[in-house]
Swiss-Prot record:
It holds the Pfam family ENTH. Residues 157-167, 279-299, 306-316, 332-346, 367-379 have a biased composition (Low complexity). GO terms for biological process: embryonic organ development; endocytosis; female pregnancy; in utero embryonic development; negative regulation of sprouting angiogenesis; Notch signaling pathway. This is Epsin-1. Its main location: cytoplasm. Binds to membranes enriched in phosphatidylinositol 4,5-bisphosphate (PtdIns(4,5)P2). Modifies membrane curvature and facilitates the formation of clathrin-coated invaginations. Regulates receptor-mediated endocytosis. The modification Phosphoserine is found at residues 382, 418-419, 434, 446, 453, 472. The lineage of its organism: Eukaryota, Metazoa, Chordata, Craniata, Vertebrata. A 1,2-diacyl-sn-glycero-3-phospho-(1D-myo-inositol-4,5-bisphosphate) binds at residues 11, 25, 30, 63, 73. Residues 274-379 are annotated as: 8 X 3 AA repeats of D-P-W. The NPF repeat domain is involved in EPS15 binding. The DPW repeat domain is involved in AP2A2 and clathrin binding. Residues 453-467, 556-569 have a biased composition (Pro residues). GO terms for cellular component: clathrin-coated pit; cytoplasm; nucleus; plasma membrane.
Amino acid sequence: MSTSSLRRQMKNIVHNYSEAEIKVREATSNDPWGPSSSLMSEIADLTYNVVAFSEIMSMIWKRLNDHGKNWRHVYKAMTLMEYLIKTGSERVSQQCKENMYAVQTLKDFQYVDRDGKDQGVNVREKAKQLVALLRDEDRLREERAHALKTKEKLAQTATASSAAVGSGPPPEAEQAWPQSSGEEELQLQLALAMSKEEADQPPSCGPEDDVQLQLALSLSREEHDKEERIRRGDDLRLQMAIEESKRETGGKEESSLMDLADVFTTPAPPQASDPWGGPASVPTAVPVAAAASDPWGGPAVPPAADPWGGAAPTPASGDPWRPAAPTGPSVDPWGGTPAPAAGEGPTPDPWGSSDGGAPVSGPPSSDPWAPAPAFSDPWGGSPAKPSSNGTAVGGFDTEPDEFSDFDRLRTALPTSGSSTGELELLAGEVPARSPGAFDMSGVGGSLAESVGSPPPAATPTPTPPTRKTPESFLGPNAALVDLDSLVSRPGPTPPGSKASNPFLPSGAPPTGPSVTNPFQPAPPATLTLNQLRLSPVPPVPGAPPTYISPLGGGPGLPPMMPPGPPAPNTNPFLL
């Protein structure tokens, strides 16, 4: 006896199943073979009993609702139901029709065993056959009549054989032989189904192979993810490096362009603005020391080197009335043009006029306030009266010209201190300052001329410009004029008064206070430094002492040097 049959017997005893229920449980067991025809015939005979019928049908419906793993219980229960419908009581077919929905649900029965085979296909096919049989009344009647005839024949054959043989038990071969055609057909179907299952069963692989396959797949996936992350990181770093290189290249190109622009672009030199409207001076290649601009429009001249070793003067203030700083020369408001270079003209006399030569290059200055390089008036009148910001210079009043920009278009006419504009012999104005007593700036040129060597060429060392003084204009006859009286600042002259004229008849009455006549004898007076230095003739006695405004005075003057040779006679009236 098998283990499954022993377990069924134990359950039958425990649950106290009836004889009919035990037979149904035996016919619908989980064994791999189908129910025997004799057992099914006995159950069909019990269906005619009302009590046994209810027990049989309740157990069959219980087997039909079993779990998927007990698919054999379901399949054998449907086989037993079909047999009972054909050979059992009519109440079986009637109850099956009433509970047809329970059979119809089995059309969707699903179960796949561990080997991957679908075992629910047999249940689904059997359910379709039962539903079709229950719905077709004619077929049901025919099948039922045929099954009953077959059962009767089998019963008669069995009775005759049993009577002939005797009361001995039939052999085992006869017990295994199907008792009816239905049972034989059922066994044949079961055998075919089982053989088909065994043929369709694929070779199963061991669990170790599945584990190794899953492990290999997971390792391959991890390696792929790692390589993808590394590739993305490399792409990101490469992109950042390319952007950084582009930024550095752009910065280098911009800096190179700026360097080239700085190299090839020369900044424009600052141009000194002329407050009197004079033309801007042409810049030269020779560097000139920083000096105050000439307020009267005189061209700037680089100072020459001092042959006596004097300290290089520094630029002075442009105010003609304020004393200059002790460390540099003062700006001459009457400053002449620069001396010509070597080989271009004679060297000017340091004690004479500085307008003997004109600059070689550049247009002449059209400043109305600058002295002309040569004045043809034998009476010595100055071309114009200099003024500073509308104030009187040297004690003579002049009104500022509002059309100073147009003065360069007309010729400057000599004027005198009188309102009538008469030409006077000595009516020309003199600068408010006389050269300093110790100013030896012009000695270098005269010494170079006397020795016969050309003056030193212009060097970057700044030298003071050549000054034009009344003594240089008058020459040796400067003693005929009282320079101190002319330089001093007398009170304002009335507009209607005339300046003194030495050629005016003695009988003509003066119209107002006149300036002191230099030709009239005067009481003796103290000699001034200018008279001691420049006058070869004793000064006119009786001249009152006057204030001398030094142009370069103050501390830090160069040491006193012996005067140079007297300048040649330039007065056309002296024979």
